[in-house]
Structures are given as structure tokens and as C-alpha cells.
Amino acid sequence: MKARELQELRQGSSPQDLQEKVQDLKSELFNLRFQLATGQLENPMRIREVKKSIAQIKTILREKELRAFEQ
């Protein structure tokens, strides 16, 4: 995920939207792992990218939670 996309997620997305995005990425990760197990995966680096994106979005969610708690 590019820095610009992350910035847009930080500023313009609600926590519900971010949760939906995490769920979509988790289902994609499941499918990628299934393809890996069956030998059909074309781009193994995609697994790493998806895991990193999930972590980045979860970090944004946590930042929003802490910001809301402080106020």
C-alpha cells in the first residue's frame, strides 16, 4: 500500500470502513494461502503485501481509537 493511500485512509475513512477493508484483505490472504498450498499461486510476494497492508490498517484503527479516547 502506497503512502498516499495510507494517508487517505487516515484522514477520510471511518473505523467501519477500515474494518471492512481488513476483512476483505483477510479473505484475500486466505485465498492466496489456498493457492499457495495447491501450487497455483503466481505471485508469492502478494502474500507479504497483503499481510503488511492488514498491519498498516490495523495500526491506523488503533491510532483512531487512541485519539478518540484522549478527547
Swiss-Prot record:
GO annotation, biological process: translation
Record keywords, A-Z: Ribonucleoprotein, Ribosomal protein
SUPFAM superfamilies reported for this sequence: Ribosomal protein L29 (L29p)
Listed Pfam families: Ribosomal_L29
GO MF entry, a single one: structural constituent of ribosome
GO cellular component labels: cytosolic large ribosomal subunit
UniProt cross-references to InterPro entries, sorted A to Z: Ribosomal_protein_uL29 (IPR050063), Ribosomal_uL29 (IPR001854), Ribosomal_uL29_CS (IPR018254), Ribosomal_uL29_sf (IPR036049)
Spans annotated as Disordered: 1-20
Transmembrane regions listed in the UniProt entry: none
Family named by the database record: Belongs to the universal ribosomal protein uL29 family.
NCBIfam families to which the protein is assigned, alphabetical: L29
Name the record gives this protein: Large ribosomal subunit protein uL29
Organism: Clostridium kluyveri (strain ATCC 8527 / DSM 555 / NBRC 12016 / NCIMB 10680 / K1)
